[in-house]
Design a protein with these regions (language model features):
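The Walker A (P-loop) glycine that initiates the GxxxxGKT/S ATP-binding motif of P-loop NTPases
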Residues: 221, 284, 306
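Peripheral, non-AAA+ core regions of ATP-driven protein-machinery
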Residues: 1-218, 222-228, 330, 470-471, ...
Length: 530
């Protein structure tokens, strides 16, 4: 007897329909074809034990299972449940006349309990597109799949539940998720708030500009200046995610199995990988590609603390994702693309010792140490960071001040208002949501300068030897500053402020070796051997 059961395979962040054909005929043997991986090939042992422990058995006949399309590789143990049901239905042990109306996924334990899977949300989205009436999956994954409207999602915990459902002995209730309630969660009780930060008004201004325009930012300052504290509070001033952004973010986390017992991810992600991370872990990849940290930070913030401590090769692989807002992983037989539209927030000490330019420190780096330290960050990578800002230690008077600081909620209102201006501006550009995403043509259109502003920018370009990409960055930041003030045109004072936020373009940070030799000798600093 031939039975068809339907499952799904996740490829990138999208799902594809898998047809599982189970045929039982005379003879002996268990034959599984259709490019299954080892986890699927081992499923017969899990299925046999699970069936035995609930009073069923594998038929003593020849079982042939085909997983179509046969040219698409199938991975993981999530096919245990549809395989088991297909065998039971094909052998006549259960009656399942409507089994072809459902997508079925789940891993079986030896006692018949059902374990969670990865990629439930993209599978549910594809199931709706393919016209299925329902989706049976582990109860731990039910909430994320139930985000998809007009699809009945049933969470199950044991194989017997599913058998009773198809035998019409037990009714299952669809899981319902209140999307509006999920969205309300993001504005309640933020873990970090800018009101916790004493002083640093100038840096808070930079963070506000970065949030308003989606600009990448690097914070440069000595240890204890508050760089990490400021970075962790950036998500609290970003505008709330819309439904499309929340779905995109949840899909990525779902593929990695990070959404168990949760519904929609409605809070912008904040990812802070350790500096020992590999390039594959950062951007994604592997023999069977998985999203990396930059995709996990999609629609949120990626924080790289102590940027020069990362391997240069790791930092360089970020150049393409920073520009294209997506990461493409190519293999011989396929290509996978993951979304990676994130805000990069990086921090670094100004020198290996952490106290370069500190007038109170008598221990400074040698010129060789300084060049080696700064050489880990390439010019092309820095060009892709819109805002470079120096963070100075907070004086005691500010730390001991008992007056209340401005809250994240207050800053977020201004940021949201600026984003609304950008939404109206880019209505005709569906792939652009904020100023940082503008290309050269759009910069020329929306960042027109008067003669005063143009002359000011020309002088800055010549004196700082800025690249064409840095020129575009300054214009984007100036446009955001104007949006925060609800100004129609970019003025010279907007340009002047934006130029200030290019610290690493100035001599003294990325200057010649002779500068550091001159600096260390003039300060009388003791040079450390490299």
């Amino acid at each position: 007897m031939l039975i068809s059961v339907f499952g799904s395979s996740v490829f990138g962040v999208e799902a594809s329909l898998i047809t599982i054909e189970v045929n039982i005929a005379g003879g002996i043997g268990y034959h599984l074809v259709g490019l299954p991986d080892n986890a699927i090939k081992e499923s017969n042992y899990r299925i046999a034990a699970a069936l035995t422990n609930i009073g069923y058995k594998l038929p003593g006949k020849k079982i042939t299972i085909n997983m179509a399309p046969a040219d698409l590789r199938k991975e993981g143990s999530a096919y245990d449940l549809p395989l088991a049901l297909g065998i039971l239905a094909a052998s006549g042990q259960i009656s399942a006349p409507n089994i072809e109306s459902y997508i079925i996924m789940g891993e079986l334990a030896l006692d018949g309990s059902i374990r969670p899977i990865k990629g439930a949300l993209p599978i549910a989205i594809q199931a709706l597109k393919d016209g299925f009436s329902g989706f049976l999956l582990p109860e731990e994954n039910a909430m994320e799949a139930a985000i998809v409207k007009d699809l009945n999602v049933y969470g199950v915990s044991h194989l017997e539940e599913v058998i009773d459902f198809f035998n019409q002995k037990k009714a299952l209730q669809p899981v319902v998720v209140d999307t509006r309630k999920e969205f309300q969660k993001q504005l309640k009780y933020p873990e970090h708030d800018f009101s916790d930060v004493k002083g640093q008004e100038g840096i808070k201004r930079c963070m506000e500009i970065a949030a308003a325009g989606g600009h990448n930012i690097i914070l440069i300052g000595p240890p204890g200046a508050g760089k990490t504290m400021l970075a962790k509070r950036l998500p609290s001033i970003l505008p709330p995610m819309n439904l499309q952004e929340a779905l995109e973010t949840t899909k990525i986390h779902s593929v990695l199995g990070k959404v168990k017992n949760k519904g929609l991810i409605s809070i912008r992600p904040f990812r802070s990988p350790h500096h020992t991370i590999s390039d594959v872990a950062l951007v994604g990849g592997g023999a069977y590609p998985q999203p990396g940290e930059i995709s996990m930070a999609h629609n949120g913030v990626l924080f790289l603390d102590e940027l020069p401590e990362f391997k240069r090769s790791v930092l360089e692989v970020m150049r393409q994702p920073l520009e294209d807002r997506e990461v493409t992983i190519s293999r011989a037989k396929f290509t996978v693309t993951y979304p990676a539209s994130f805000m990069l927030v990086a921090s670094m000490n100004p020198s290996p010792t952490g106290y370069f330019t500190d007038p109170y420190s008598k221990l400074g780096p040698s010129a060789t140490e300084m060049q080696r330290y700064m050489g880990k960050i390439s010019g092309p990578l820095l060009d892709r960071i819109d805002i470079h800002i120096e963070v100075e230690p907070v004086p005691f008077e500010k730390l001991s001040d008992t007056r209340a600081e401005e809250s994240s909620e207050s800053i977020r209102k201004r940021v949201t208002a600026a984003r609304e201006h950008q939404t109206l501006r880019f209505e005709a550009h569906p792939n652009i949501n904020y100023n940082a995403q503008m290309n050269t043509r759009q910069i020329r259109k929306y960042c027109k300068l008067d003669s005063t502003s143009s002359d000011l920018l020309k002088k800055a370009m010549e004196r700082l030897s800025l690249s064409a990409r840095a020129y575009d960055r300054i214009l984007k930041v100036a446009r955001t500053i104007a949006d925060l003030e609800a100004a129609t045109a970019v003025q010279s004072f907007h340009i002047a402020e934006a130029i200030q936020y290019r610290s690493l373009d100035r001599e003294g940070w990325m200057g010649l070796k002779s500068y550091f030799l001159k600096y260390t000798s003039s300060k009388g600093m003791r040079k450390r051997s490299p």
